[in-house]
Amino acid sequence: MKKTAIFGGTFNPPHIGHRFMLEGIASQPEIEKILIMPAKIPPHKSDVVSAEHRVNMCKMAFCGIEKCEISLEELNLPGKSYTVNTLHHLNKKGIKNPVLVIGADSLVNFYKWYRYDEILSLAELYVYKREGIDVAILLSAKKELEKQGAKITILDIYPPAVSSTDIRVAFGKAENLKTLLEPNVLKYINEHSLY
């Protein structure tokens, strides 16, 4: 059965870790399409550059990755970005067999997500490994959510330990970021003085 992966994030900015994850997801034979979905107003974040800039950077950072397309669906929804609302919207638009891609850190805290139980009924979860998350803790969280009907696959994808937050801090210190960002994204950030 072919599936559509939902890869959401703030992408503030998109970096090589995101690209690594997308390439790994694209290599999964059952994945037909990957919707890269920038968040409109992340409920837990406030220091975010405009949606227009983040979409432009995503287009540059992820161009050429098989099966990927930038989706503006979440950006066009009213109010704050909640995964459950986005999944309901995608279902109405005919997206069947969605797979929500999240990090191991998110799985461990998934019960804190807004209407998480409803999310579990709407989408399968693909989980990529994250530095600092013990495998035993990850497997325990997986088991607990599966008791609630979740379908969860732990991917053998271990992205580089890089975060958008660290990149923004590094910009403030004028550190070299050539190894963390695609060259055209770095140029775009500098041209628009985003961070």
Predicted region positions:
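Nucleotidyltransferase catalytic core that binds NTPs
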Residues: 1-195
